[in-house]
UniProtKB/Swiss-Prot annotation:
<keyword id="KW-0378">Hydrolase</keyword>
<dbReference type="GO" id="GO:0004518">
    <property type="term" value="F:nuclease activity"/>
</dbReference>
<keyword id="KW-0690">Ribosome biogenesis</keyword>
<dbReference type="InterPro" id="IPR037027">
    <property type="entry name" value="YqgF/RNaseH-like_dom_sf"/>
</dbReference>
<dbReference type="Pfam" id="PF03652">
    <property type="entry name" value="RuvX"/>
</dbReference>
<keyword id="KW-0540">Nuclease</keyword>
<dbReference type="GO" id="GO:0005829">
    <property type="term" value="C:cytosol"/>
</dbReference>
<dbReference type="InterPro" id="IPR005227">
    <property type="entry name" value="YqgF"/>
</dbReference>
<dbReference type="GO" id="GO:0000967">
    <property type="term" value="P:rRNA 5'-end processing"/>
</dbReference>
<comment type="similarity">
    <text>Belongs to the YqgF nuclease family.</text>
</comment>
<keyword id="KW-0963">Cytoplasm</keyword>
<comment type="function">
    <text>Could be a nuclease involved in processing of the 5'-end of pre-16S rRNA.</text>
</comment>
<dbReference type="InterPro" id="IPR012337">
    <property type="entry name" value="RNaseH-like_sf"/>
</dbReference>
<dbReference type="InterPro" id="IPR006641">
    <property type="entry name" value="YqgF/RNaseH-like_dom"/>
</dbReference>
<protein>
    <recommendedName>
        <fullName>Putative pre-16S rRNA nuclease</fullName>
        <ecNumber>3.1.-.-</ecNumber>
    </recommendedName>
</protein>
Length: 155
């Protein structure tokens, strides 16, 4: 399997905010203007909607994948972390790309604040709120772009 450091720093990455019902997806590149929310993928009883994920993968052809690592504020493990790590392993097996983890603490809060600002500016509507998961994924990608050395390898 590819190593964590194998993601080209100038390559395109897809980032994921993994939840129990939805997975936010964002794309980013160091050569572009940060990250952009691109999709919200539903998670069913038997796992994520792989058809939708395959479609996003084919559209963006990333060089690597960045999964949010949901640590608690005191660096403890939690069920959400096990889910995110399992999803990262599935991504690595399915797409044969390097997968890294990046601390996602407060990414959903930051995404909600961005959404509120964009809504106040008239750029978002209430019905766009379902895109919050994808906005959180964009925060995760931006964190990786800003400090790729802070990423950890998937166990």
């Amino acid at each position: 399997m590819p190593e964590a450091g194998a993601i080209r720093p100038d390559g395109t990455v897809l980032g994921f905010d993994v939840g129990s019902r939805r997975i936010g997806v964002a794309v980013g590149t160091a050569l572009g203007a940060g990250a952009r929310a691109v999709a919200v993928i539903n998670v069913h009883a038997n796992g994520p909607d792989w058809v939708a994920l395959d479609r996003v993968y084919k559209q963006w052809r990333p060089d690597g994948l960045v999964v949010g690592d949901p640590l608690t504020l005191d660096d403890k493990d939690q069920p959400a972390r096990k889910r995110a790590h399992a999803f990262g392993r599935q991504l690595r097996e399915r797409y044969a790309l390097p997968v890294v983890l990046i601390d996602e603490r407060s990414s959903s809060v930051e995404a909600a604040q961005r959404f509120a600002r964009e809504r106040a500016d008239g750029r978002k509507r209430r019905r766009d709120a379902e895109a919050l998961d994808a906005m959180a994924a964009a925060v995760i990608v931006e964190r990786w772009l800003a400090a790729p050395d802070q990423a950890t390898s998937l166990p």
